[in-house]
Design a protein with these regions (language model features):
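Canonical tetratricopeptide repeat
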Residues: 274, 308, 342-343, 379, ...
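Helix-start (N-cap) detector for alpha-helical repeat units in TPR-like alpha-solenoids
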Residues: 269, 303-304, 320, 337-338, ...
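Catalytic Zn2+-binding segment of zinc metalloproteases
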Residues: 96-113, 129
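Residue at a conserved register position within TPR or TPR-like alpha-solenoid repeats
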Residues: 279, 313, 347-350, 384, ...
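Alpha-helical linker/edge segments of TPR/alpha-solenoid repeat scaffolds
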Residues: 192-193, 317-320, 352-356, 387-395, ...
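Extracytoplasmic and endomembrane cell-envelope/extracellular-matrix remodeling and assembly machinery
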Residues: 26-28, 32, 54, 149, ...
Length: 454
């Protein structure tokens, strides 16, 4: 997987390693869908969609969480397990309830602990992994202190988030059926793993989270009495969700599992999408290209199909061939930053000096609209290096290092940029900002190291 990701140019499924050491998956189509799904819920909650967002985490577990700020983190496993976009909206609404409620997450040594909020408790997770004895042990009285320590949201906070989520769903005019059906899935899963038991040691009221079955009963009245309960689902969102779900399955899952789930006889858009990724991961570029060509033939103006076509060409050693579909995908997607950064990478990969100006233009546009793309900064730095612009090469390196948490490189590169840029210019001020933040972080690291050595 890492070998493949090293080749990816950030427009398709791009990995970013945050401080919490969890992998964030970035994809233009997926992010657009999640933002469209969450937008009415953010508005209903009184949050600005410009300042709030949903981030996808590479993790097969069924989970979502908040960790400070106005960001909802959703695991890829939740997308895989959901039957509809409406179910995911129910989970997002619940998470927004935590944000609006100001529910603090557990902090340990200055770092946030990611919290499971869907009642898949530690014991259930252990049982699901095949360790029944370990799961039972976690649920014993002697382990309750550990559960209480590492699961930060209290039962009251969970119930409060449920109530707030139901309110936001109803206010947004979205059916609450998905919220209830997803909680029903969780209840069934807990039954399957033997969580519900007559064992007196397993006291539902002693758990940090309320039980899913109790939460469903509490939610029913609020959701079922709302005018939007029987409102038809947004079919545009549902169709897009099935596409994204298939794309993620093709990208994340074992190719054998993907091909079993979407056999060649299945000629749906979702199946072509999933198989294209599965074949691409498996090192079969011709089969991957054939699946992608079927998608482009069906919808020749779909930017995400064109993006995939260009990506496969690029990674198959044909960067020149990749430019046309990626250029069209960028235009059709209103210059989506992640797609534009892939176009910039393809232009660079031709090693043709005639393409440097266009590469610089599209990459600068990409980072201007999305500053959280380290690969785009890497490519932009390469453009500057090939043009002999040492100052901006150093600044781009500082930007990327700062984003990746590489304090030492950010500090040195920002100093180098400041030394070469006109003092007071916009780029010089930006280099100074990075330098000041990096210097503070560097000093704190040295102080901490000194305390540990005492």
């Amino acid at each position: 997987m890492k070998r493949i990701l090293a080749l990816l140019s950030a427009a398709l499924l791009l990995w970013v390693q945050p401080a919490a050491a969890q992998s964030i998956l970035r994809d233009a189509e997926t992010e657009a869908l999640l933002n469209d799904m969450a937008r009415p819920l953010f508005i209903a909650a009184g949050l600005s969609p410009a300042n709030a967002k949903v981030v996808l985490i590479q993790d097969s577990s069924i989970n979502a969480f908040v960790a400070g700020g106005q960001i909802v983190y959703v695991h890829s496993g939740l997308i895989d397990a959901a039957s509809s976009a409406n179910e995911v909206q129910g989970v997002i609404a619940h998470e927004i309830g935590h944000i609006v409620g100001g529910h603090a997450v557990f902090q340990n040594d200055g770092g946030y602990t990611n919290i499971s909020i869907l009642s898949l408790l530690l014991g259930v997770a252990a049982m699901a992994a095949g360790s029944g004895e370990a799961g039972t042990g976690i649920l014993m009285a002697g382990q309750r202190a550990a559960i209480g320590k590492y699961l930060a949201f209290s039962r009251v906070q969970e119930s409060s988030a449920d109530a707030a989520g139901a309110k936001f769903i109803n206010s947004a005019g979205i059916s609450g059926k998905g919220m209830l059906s997803f909680f029903d899935k969780l209840t069934a899963q807990m039954h399957r793993y033997g969580y519900y038991t007559s064992n007196p040691e397993v006291d539902p009221f002693a758990q940090t989270h309320p039980m899913s079955q109790d939460r469903v009963e509490t939610l029913k009245a609020d959701l079922m009495n709302a005018p939007s309960w029987n409102k038809p689902l947004d079919q545009n969102l549902e169709v897009r969700f099935k596409r994204v779900q298939a794309k993620l399955r093709g990208y994340v899952s074992d190719p054998k599992d993907t091909l079993a789930k979407y056999p060649p006889g299945n000629q749906s858009v979702e199946a072509h999408y999933a198989r294209a990724y599965a074949y691409h991961k498996s090192g079969y570029p011709e089969q991957a290209a054939a699946e992608t060509q079927a998608l482009v033939k069906a919808e020749p103006k779909d930017p995400y199909f064109l993006e995939l076509e260009g990506q496969i060409m690029l990674e198959s050693g044909d960067p020149r061939g990749a430019i046309a579909p990626l250029r069209e995908a960028t235009a059709l997607s209103n210059n989506a930053p992640l797609i534009a950064s892939t176009l910039g990478h393809a232009l660079l990969a031709t090693e043709d000096k005639a393409n440097l100006d266009e590469a610089e233009r599209v990459l600068k546009q990409s980072v201007a609209r999305d500053n959280d793309n380290p690969f785009a900064w890497l490519n932009l730095g390469t453009v500057y290096d090939r043009k002999g612009d040492e100052a901006r090469t150093a600044l781009a390196t500082a930007e990327r290092a700062h984003m990746m948490g590489d304090v030492g490189t950010a500090l040195m590169s920002s100093r180098a940029a400041m030394a070469r840029l006109p003092q007071g210019s916009a780029d010089w001020v930006r280099a100074q900002d990075i330098n000041m933040v990096s210097q503070t972080a560097w000093d704190e690291m040295r102080k901490k190291k000194g305390r540990q050595g005492q």
